[in-house]
Structure formats: C-alpha cells, structure tokens
Amino acid sequence: MLSPSKTVGEFTLIRHFQNILKSQAIPRGAIGIGDDASVYPQGKHASWLMTHDMLLAGIHFLPPQGRGWWELGWKALAVNLSDIAAMGGRPSQALVGLGLPDKLSPSGLQNFYRGLKACAKK
C-alpha cells in the first residue's frame, strides 16, 4: 500500500502497479510493465516493444526558451528510443503525448517537432 505522507519514486510505483495488475490476463510470452518497455509477441519471430517516458519541466529539464524546444523534442524521443534499445529492439513508430504551457509560441512547437524529427532520422 502506498503512503500519502511519503514521496513515491518511479520503481516503487512500478512495483505497486505490478501488484495491482498481476491478476490481469497477460498474453502468453508477453512481459508487462517494467522499467524499460513492455514486450508483446507477434508470431514466432517478432515482438512489439512499447514504451512511453514522460518528461516533466523542472524535473527532467528546465523550461525551454527559444531553440531549447528543439533539444527538448530530441530528448523526448531519445529517452524512449533508449528504452527500446535496452530491450534489444529496433524502433519503427512513435507516439507523442504533450502537455504544453499556455504561452507556447508556434515557433517553439515547430522547433520541438523539428528536434523530434531530427532524432527520428538518426
């Protein structure tokens, strides 16, 4: 059980969710929630690896100014690609989830996607 008076870290949360979800039916051969990625077999010789890391302003990065959005776009994809690589996978697709500040300029958003695209091409 989680204590409301205590700061909960990433790995404590993962273990907590694993305990809650352990009664869920997991497809044969699948590896559920963990630190890097979940594994879902797709036939005899292939699997899907799924991951999603969220970056929080003030924790994982300082709020960007100007070109900093490009670097943040790069980092947002790179942290997820590294999870796929850690599992021995090769990335083919990405899902982007954004929580944006009210005052984000259109050029900031463009720079974010340019950084993300540059990382994807690498």
Where in the sequence are the language-model features?
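A glycine-rich phosphate/pyrophosphate-binding beta-strand-loop-alpha-helix module
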Residues: 68-122
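Extreme N-terminal cap/leader segments of soluble proteins
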Residues: 1-68, 87, 96, 114, ...
